[in-house]
Amino acid sequence: MIRALYIGRFQPYHNGHHYVINQIAQEADELIIGIGSAQMSHEPADPFTAGERVLMITGALQDLHKPLYVIPLEDINRNVLWVSHVRAMTPPFHRIYSGNPLVIRLFHEAGIEVLSPAMYERATLSGTKIRDLIACDKPWEDFVPPAVVRVIQEIDGISRIRALNQDDGDCPGR
């Protein structure tokens, strides 16, 4: 049995994450989704709380048909200890999937198998781009699973993102 870990900030969870997780699910029997920087929220780059991100992810993956654990992981700002922190906060896992060079290095040095999944449509599917679209009142809904649209609407995330970004001046006509 293979239990795999995939860590991301998921600000918000989008179709790129969804594609990668579905690819991982073809190789693993159980999945652990680690919500990185769980302590961050209500910031332009991190508008959603860990709990809101849990709702997005569990809603989007309800049809995965695999055991799934969604675990918030707070930053500890001591990279040398971070892998131990992650291990303490998650069920035991056999491998990690990541495209983040620091995460790859830290887990590799800890002797854990690290696989780098191919990014999916990275040019259009990034949390930054989706947050910018929301902030600028442009269509964004097609870039995230329907469950994520529902959560963002339910928590009034659109107005939160716009308020957090109101002073950046990057949106024409705003």
Curated annotation (Swiss-Prot):
<dbReference type="GO" id="GO:0009435">
    <property type="term" value="P:NAD biosynthetic process"/>
</dbReference>
<dbReference type="InterPro" id="IPR006418">
    <property type="entry name" value="NMN_Atrans_arc"/>
</dbReference>
<keyword id="KW-0067">ATP-binding</keyword>
<keyword id="KW-0808">Transferase</keyword>
<keyword id="KW-0547">Nucleotide-binding</keyword>
<dbReference type="InterPro" id="IPR014729">
    <property type="entry name" value="Rossmann-like_a/b/a_fold"/>
</dbReference>
<keyword id="KW-0548">Nucleotidyltransferase</keyword>
<dbReference type="Pfam" id="PF01467">
    <property type="entry name" value="CTP_transf_like"/>
</dbReference>
<keyword id="KW-0520">NAD</keyword>
<keyword id="KW-0963">Cytoplasm</keyword>
<comment type="similarity">
    <text>Belongs to the archaeal NMN adenylyltransferase family.</text>
</comment>
<keyword id="KW-0662">Pyridine nucleotide biosynthesis</keyword>
<protein>
    <recommendedName>
        <fullName>Nicotinamide-nucleotide adenylyltransferase</fullName>
        <ecNumber>2.7.7.1</ecNumber>
    </recommendedName>
</protein>
<dbReference type="GO" id="GO:0005524">
    <property type="term" value="F:ATP binding"/>
</dbReference>
<dbReference type="GO" id="GO:0005737">
    <property type="term" value="C:cytoplasm"/>
</dbReference>
<dbReference type="InterPro" id="IPR004821">
    <property type="entry name" value="Cyt_trans-like"/>
</dbReference>
<dbReference type="GO" id="GO:0000309">
    <property type="term" value="F:nicotinamide-nucleotide adenylyltransferase activity"/>
</dbReference>
<comment type="pathway">
    <text>Cofactor biosynthesis; NAD(+) biosynthesis; NAD(+) from nicotinamide D-ribonucleotide: step 1/1.</text>
</comment>
